[in-house]
A protein has these predicted regions:
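Active-site neighborhood of HAD-like aspartate-dependent phosphohydrolases
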Residues: 1-78
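Short, electropositive alpha-helical surface patch
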Residues: 92-111, 202-205
């Protein structure tokens, strides 16, 4: 039963694209002086820059939902460590991870299971004490080896089929908040955590 699994969770890990975001990736031309201009790249590559030519001339941006940011704070108050594991590399994600004070942030990862096992060793935890939130097939190896596997509402069918819990909201629209609420409520800490969260932001006068 997924509620029983949720009661054991001490670590919550998640993907970024499609989980913290809706999966959309915005690309913008890099500011002048930051990288070589598109024209310079084109000249260097004889007009055939390919994927490298484009990626070196662009900057990546992502959008995040405020509810998911609050979820990280709520998880922390419940004594749950948090972290992200993502295939892409983005300064935007690095900034968001620092802003949210995540315990773990791994980017550029193809083999997510190896990183998952590394984090478990660092934290001194067992697989059944970790939850993972994913949306696509690259997340399945971790989801198959963690205690509570969570799929966002718009995850691929293969991912939903193997999840212990499917969120009400879509990726980038509060899905991580759903996962945190589910876990913290299963542990009987929700009301206490909400009180502590509001107390921190509205101290008694």
């Amino acid at each position: 039963m997924s509620v029983e699994r949720a009661r054991k969770i001490k670590l919550l890990l998640f993907d970024v694209d499609g989980v913290l975001t809706d999966g959309t990736i915005w690309l913008f031309p890099a500011p002048a002086g930051v990288q070589l201009s598109t024209q310079q790249h084109a000249r260097q590559h004889g007009g055939e820059g390919g994927f490298g030519f484009v990626s070196q001339s662009m900057m990546e941006a992502k959008g995040f939902h405020a509810h998911d940011g609050t979820a990280i704070s709520l998880a922390r108050l419940a004594g749950i460590k948090t972290g992200l594991i993502t295939k892409r590399i983005s300064e935007t994600v690095a900034l968001r991870a620092r802003d949210l004070k995540l315990d773990h942030a791994y980017q550029g990862i193809q083999d997510k299971l190896t990183v998952f096992e590394e984090i478990l060793r660092k934290e001194g935890l067992r697989p059944e004490q970790a939850a993972y939130v994913g949306d696509d097939v690259i997340d399945l190896p971790v989801m198959r080896n963690c205690g509570l596997s969570v799929a966002v509402a718009n995850a691929r069918a293969e991912v939903k089929d193997e999840a212990h819990y499917v969120t009400e909201h879509r990726g980038g629209d509060g899905a991580l908040r759903d996962a945190v609420e589910y876990i913290v409520k299963a542990q009987g800490k929700w009301e206490e955590v909400v009180r502590e969260y509001t107390r921190e932001r509205s101290p008694a006068r």
